[in-house]
Design a protein with these regions (language model features):
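Acidic, metal-binding active-site segment of PIN/NYN-like and related structure-specific nucleases
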Residues: 46-69
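Polar low-complexity intrinsically disordered regions
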Residues: 2-17, 21-22, 27-30, 62-81, ...
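Short, mixed-charge, low-aromatic patches
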Residues: 1-4, 41-52, 129-130
């Protein structure tokens, strides 16, 4: 399985930007899985054991209960026209640059900060853009 899995609702122009800068990228319904897969019922079980980062626009996935030791979920709360830019910026952030740094987290990306849940932590954490 690839390292970066993008939800089917990521626009084509954002995927184009990401594919130019990031290796090991697939999009649900295009390169992997099927269109119409439900996030919780069908996508998340496929991520178990994958060590993948799942990128989504679905705010419903920004919940502590979705933290898992073998994958990461990143929810983008940014303008759709700027998605590609924010994916690249996130992957260059010093706290989330590597796969190991991202694992076990559910992260919300916004223009002002990164907010995240981490497995076995009971409080939400925040970090600023550098």
């Amino acid at each position: 399985m690839k390292s970066h899995i993008f939800d089917e609702n990521f626009p084509a122009f954002a995927m184009h930007t990401v594919r130019q800068k990031v290796a090991s990228v697939v999009q649900i319904g295009q390169d992997w899985g099927e269109n119409g897969w439900l996030d919780v019922e069908e996508i998340l079980p496929q991520l178990h054991g994958s060590r993948a980062t799942f990128h989504t626009l679905d705010a419903g996935l920004f919940k502590r209960r979705y933290c898992h030791g073998s994958y990461c979920i990143v929810y983008y709360d940014v303008l759709e026209t700027e998605l590609g830019k924010w994916v690249i910026k996130f992957l260059k952030h010093h706290n989330f640059r590597t796969q190991v740094q991202r694992l076990s987290k559910v992260i919300r990306i916004s223009p002002t900060k990164l907010t995240y849940w981490e497995l076995h932590a009971y409080a939400i954490r925040k970090t600023e853009w550098q």
